[in-house]
Amino acid sequence: MPIPALVAAPLLAVALAAVVTFATPALLRWLPVPPDEGEVAPFVTLATPTFRAAVFACSAVAGGIAFACLPPAHWPAWVGLVSVGVLLGLVDLRTTFLPLRLTYLAVALAALGVAVSAWLRADAWVLVSAAVAGTLGAGFFWLVWRVSRGFAFGDVRLAGLIGIVVGTEGRAFAFAAFFLGTLVGALWALAVRRRKAADEPFPYGPALLLGPLVALLVTRLLLPG
């Protein structure tokens, strides 16, 4: 990676993390309480200093990994995932909910970023690849949800978001991202189930979101070329 990009990558990651952290209270206030879940505290109650520090740290690390591993023309496609997507994962971790509005915001940012990335790369097939991966990712998780009910429907929508982003890096990378995210989720679920009841809700979203980042580290840093 050229020296200017090496400097810009961490700066952009920190800047995005600062923006999403600053916006966290307003975004959480914007989210309605799930209507069919009984007594659930408003999402804005999550916006404690500790939670916001976690948002900043996780977003900065996620952005740093993505931008360090990829050429600058690829960065826009990842902006939504490493900012609002990270907030979405932390909300899921704390509440086991993946709020619809926040998911759609992340999808909108990802779609816009993919369009910008395709333009910067002068490659319209980036749009096609992102659309196909998003559809296949959501479709596969919908099928699993339909058959087993092993996770909530919010994870189906999240898979679509992830597919849109990882699809810009090609079929092999998209497969690796979903495989690694599913593997992390399975191992995490096994560890959690040892301490909790089998029917207790499990936050699968954070594991899915880790998949693309682990795939980047493995394919770009540990296995270059």
Where are these regions (language model features)?
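A membrane-topology feature that recognizes alpha-helical transmembrane segments
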Residues: M1-G225
